Amino acid sequence: MEANFVSSALAGVQNNRSVKRSLDRLKSLFSSGQHQLNGSLGKKVFILLALGGGAFSLVKFYKAKNEGSSKQSGLIIDLKDKNSKKDKKRNVTRVDAVFFRRLAKIIRIVIPSLKSKEFLSLLYLTALLFARTMLSVSIAEIAGKNAQNLVARKWKEMRNGVLKFALVSIPASFVNASLKYETDMLALRFRKRLSEYVHKEYLEGVNFYKASHLGGADRIDNADQRVTSDIEQFCNSMSSLYTTLFKPFLDLVLFTRKLVVVMGWGSPLLMFSYFIVSGFLKKLIMPPFGRLTAKQSELEGNYRTVHQRLITNAEEIAFYDGSRKERQIINLSFGDIYNHTGYVSYLKCLVGIFDGFLVKYCASIVGYGCMVLPIYTGIRGSSGKDSTELTKDYIRNTQLMVALSQAIGQLVLLGNKVTLMAGYTSRVSELLEMIKSIKERGTSQFTIVHEDDVPNPLTNSPVNDKYDTSVDMSSWLEDWRKRSDQTRIVKRQQSNRSSASGATTVYGGGTFVEGDFIKFENVSIVSPEGKLLVENLDFQVMPNQNVMITGPNGSGKSSLFRILGELWPLHCGTVIKPRKEDILFVPQKPYLVLGTLRDQIIYPHSHDDMKKLGVTDDDLQHLLATVDPNLTIIRQWNWDDTKDWFTALSGGQKQRIAMARLFYHRPQYAILDECTSAVSDEVEGKIYETCKKLGITLFTVSHRPQLRAYHDYVLLFNGRGGWEWSKIDHDDDHLKKPLSH
């Protein structure tokens, strides 16, 4: 049946005159070329490879080298300075001389010598690839002979052919499974070698500290992402790239050699010519997958970072009741990943459609032409063969042509994987280059920058002329207090519609009661480990009565505030306190949210929340000016500037930001945990004066005696479960009326 189909197809083609004339011209071309090719078979194969596979590789690498003109939108939440020239330079990911130089350096790390396990594994993988190609050629020969015997009804030969196929399938199965295993193991060995090298260099001395704190221009983002995920992806990509490159090239050599023997050089040349044209067409539409891959890794690193920040600053965020804001940040970060991944998947889909049409289906059409032309032209005696011989040649040549077209197609698609690998190579190389730069710099001293050499932010600021310094701050603070009181009244009215005032909540073994003051009645503070920190605590704080809390480390000072913030359950007793939004915690190391300068002041509010409250940027400037008299912050940055504020701000500026945040929210009670240690005595005094004007009652954790002037009571923990409550006599500057337990 197969032979009849082939004969009918050829007869139909020959009956069409127009097609026949075209085939006659091709026949003369093929015949002349066949007689002119008198050199060795190796020379013929070399010419075909030079015209075919080499051209495809050049096309793809030329495409990759000149990619990068496309632009991709950046992060909604950027964890580094977008204006950094260093970052802009790093974001360029191309397959160029820099890529090959970086790749060569990494290869010398993962394959240190010819005697290494990695190189031996590479040799074994090469042998498996060669064996697989030879087995494919054998299977094609067996399939062709089996088809011939089937058409000729030679059942004995057919049985022997099936037996040969079964015998060949045994080593073929072993080779196929071993190829997958060795590819994975090679990637794993690469990762082990590269990870150990990075660990050695990154953790040598204090390089890890310098990388995150003293890196300067060499500091990079998401070092943890690069050390873990990016190294893994790079090693997987490099291992896969070797098999993707070597096997198609080997198939190209062996299958072309076999096809030239049985079909002549015309059909392979036609196939090569088609793929050259399709390669140039593909070059025109190929997106910059290398840069998109690097962007994907960056977004994944940012997503991991926001989760790490949540874990690291969990207590501060809980005190601020910032879960809603953090959820928005995390959702935005994941949204960036979702949008970018969807965009990349869409591009891959379009490229896949183009690849499927050109590389698979159109290549099959060209392959059919390659199969028909040798038979029609009579090359290699095809015209004199009977139907069984034609069937054998058809089946065998079909399998060889399919394998050859797949090999060429893989070489055409090789550029995709190279550009993807370029993204991971860039990420890993930046990490290695940063470590090398830090080691070369060693312990060299910092360069002194004189004030005359840099622009003065106080005179070159975009908001320098916008801030009105003539405002009477006392009057403005009084007005701010009235506005805050009105806002609090509205919020309470809205809240009371859904819950009764003075609500009682049983939490753990004790009871929380809502009130306008703070009172502890027979409260024992127990740590999560079961340690009794404070026993039977009993005191009361009315509005405008500031309390100073002292005691040794681990005595229960911070634990008291965890009880107030309802982070810990009550072991026993009763706590009367205002609503959670009326108590604000200011830690020693302020929490700085991902976002703009404005977000640092209004956290956990959003910009829309701020507008709904009727607060303007001018109000924020006045609040910040109360703790930053020299206006160093508001004159150096705009409110919409986005930076890594943890590194951009000094210790004193961070504490000023935290106090401005306190004044913005203006709670009834505030807990200050050594939060003024980095500001001057003058600014510190102004902070306490402002709190008094705004009607904020303070709990201050501090051991500095000079702060007693701003407080009315002292709560002392002795570290053994005992405590002492005393009133401060400001006339004699000492404590009186102690109440101990």
From Swiss-Prot:
Transmembrane segments: 39-59, 119-139, 260-280
Gene Ontology annotations for the cellular component aspect, listed alphabetically: ATP-binding cassette (ABC) transporter complex; peroxisomal membrane
Database matches in InterPro entries: AAA+_ATPase, ABC1_TM_dom, ABC1_TM_sf, ABC_transporter-like_ATP-bd, ABC_transporter-like_CS, ABC_transporter_sub-D, P-loop_NTPase
SUPFAM superfamilies: ABC transporter transmembrane region (SSF90123), P-loop containing nucleoside triphosphate hydrolases (SSF52540)
Organism in which the protein naturally occurs: Dictyostelium discoideum
Cross-referenced SMART domains: AAA (SM00382)
UniProt-listed PROSITE patterns: ABC_TM1F, ABC_TRANSPORTER_1, ABC_TRANSPORTER_2
Protein name as catalogued: ABC transporter D family member 2
Membrane topology: Multi-pass membrane protein
Encoding gene, per UniProt annotation: abcD2
Predominant localisation class: membrane
UniProt keywords, alphabetically: ATP-binding, Membrane, Nucleotide-binding, Transmembrane, Transmembrane helix, Transport
Binding-site positions, ATP: G551, P552, N553, G554, S555, G556, K557, S558
Occurrences of domain ABC transmembrane type-1 (ranges): 131-409
A GO molecular function held by the record: ATP binding
Segments forming domain ABC transporter: 518-740
Family as reported in the entry's similarity comment: Belongs to the ABC transporter superfamily. ABCD family. Peroxisomal fatty acyl CoA transporter (TC 3.A.1.203) subfamily.
GO BP term, pick one: sorocarp morphogenesis
Cellular compartment(s): Membrane
